[in-house]
């Protein structure tokens, strides 16, 4: 029977992580459970840095960006001996189960702990929206709001100078944030990792737009696809239009979470406690068709496919 749980945030921070922690803590306390917060993700778990959390520990947290527990990259957690120390620390503290909030790397750590016999529940916390088994991740919609605001501002200056702007958006190897921002921001062109890309094809599309009378344009592109400064120089050289690159960077991860992320994080946090009390371990939580769902975390990581939002891309292209 579960009496005490641990909660940690891991990997890149995302707006809404604090709301998720709050959801876990308040739901657990309402069921008579104790909660230990673990500082700095798996690193803090390995180093046994924990704190008892009560309802006041998470007061005024639902609107705060980042994660008050902290987060850290800890690749050494791949080592089974390191994980064995982590499990020993959990058992020493009387912790019966662990809730992990983070991205795919965080899920991998939770999966490994599950394989070693320690029950974990994973909550998807990343702005990249690249987690299997869920339509949306905690932080995605806040990051989208941030990106669209930046695009709106760039459009003002691009329009004034009849300039082409290339905007690099986070997402790693997932184009969801770029696609959504392109539609919401009215971008003329979008480049995502799921679709083959060539500079020449992009330039031809831009030239076609200029021929139709476009005076300025915004190109949204997912990070890691190319050097955006070099791409901007190439576009300027081929089109004769002044072109500038903007890398939004880590500003996309910050800020107060939008209401949808607060609601999603709160629901997922409370749902994690429901699952643990129902005897589930080794699960990851998602939202599909606005319904909370859970999947076997090993199956989700190793076997599930994450569908590409091709309909979003088609929509963006129709609106160029």
UniProtKB/Swiss-Prot annotation:
Swiss-Prot/TrEMBL catalytic activity: beta-D-fructose 6-phosphate + ATP = beta-D-fructose 1,6-bisphosphate + ADP + H(+)
GO cellular component: 6-phosphofructokinase complex
Keywords annotated in UniProt: Allosteric enzyme, ATP-binding, Cytoplasm, Glycolysis, Kinase, Magnesium, Metal-binding, Nucleotide-binding, Transferase
Listed EC numbers: 2.7.1.11
Annotated binding of ADP, by residue: 22-26, 55-60, 155, 186-188, 212, 214-216
Major localization listed first in the record, in broad terms: cytoplasm
Keyword set includes Kinase: yes
Location of the protein in the cell: Cytoplasm
Pfam families tied to this protein: PFK
Family of this protein: Belongs to the phosphofructokinase type A (PFKA) family. ATP-dependent PFK group I subfamily. Prokaryotic clade 'B1' sub-subfamily.
Quaternary structure, from the entry: Homotetramer.
Name of the molecule in the record: ATP-dependent 6-phosphofructokinase
Protein species of origin: Escherichia fergusonii (strain ATCC 35469 / DSM 13698 / CCUG 18766 / IAM 14443 / JCM 21226 / LMG 7866 / NBRC 102419 / NCTC 12128 / CDC 0568-73)
């Amino acid at each position: 029977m579960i009496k005490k749980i641990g909660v940690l945030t891991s990997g890149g921070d995302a707006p809404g992580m604090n709301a998720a922690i709050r959801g876990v803590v308040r739901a657990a306390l309402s069921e008579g459970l104790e909660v230990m917060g673990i500082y700095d993700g798996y690193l803090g778990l390995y180093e046994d840095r924990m704190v008892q959390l009560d309802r006041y520990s998470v007061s005024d947290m639902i609107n705060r960006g980042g994660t008050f527990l902290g987060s850290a990259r800890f690749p050494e957690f791949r080592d089974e001996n390191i994980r064995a120390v982590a499990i020993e620390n959990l058992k020493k503290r009387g912790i019966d189960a662990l809730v992990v909030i983070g991205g795919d790397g965080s899920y991998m750590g939770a999966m490994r702990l599950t394989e070693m016999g320690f029950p974990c529940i994973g909550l998807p916390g990343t702005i990249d929206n690249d987690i299997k088994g869920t339509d949306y991740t905690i932080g995605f919609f806040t990051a989208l709001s941030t990106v669209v605001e930046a695009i709106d501002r760039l459009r003002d200056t691009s329009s004034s100078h009849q300039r082409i702007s290339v905007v690099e958006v986070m997402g790693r190897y997932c184009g969801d944030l770029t696609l959504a921002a392109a539609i919401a921001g009215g971008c003329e062109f979008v480049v995502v990792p799921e679709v083959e890309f060539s500079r020449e094809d992009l330039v031809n599309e831009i030239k076609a737009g200029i021929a139709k009378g476009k005076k300025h344009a915004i190109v949204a592109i997912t990070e890691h696809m190319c050097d955006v400064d070099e791409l901007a120089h190439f576009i300027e050289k081929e089109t004769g239009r002044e072109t500038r690159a903007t890398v939004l960077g880590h500003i996309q991860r910050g800020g107060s979470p939008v209401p949808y992320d607060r609601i999603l994080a709160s629901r997922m946090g409370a749902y994690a406690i429901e699952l643990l009390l129902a005897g589930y371990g080794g699960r990851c939580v998602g939202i599909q068709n606005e319904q909370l769902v859970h999947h076997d975390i090993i199956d989700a990581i190793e076997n599930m496919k994450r569908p590409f939002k091709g309909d979003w891309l088609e929509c963006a292209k129709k609106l160029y």
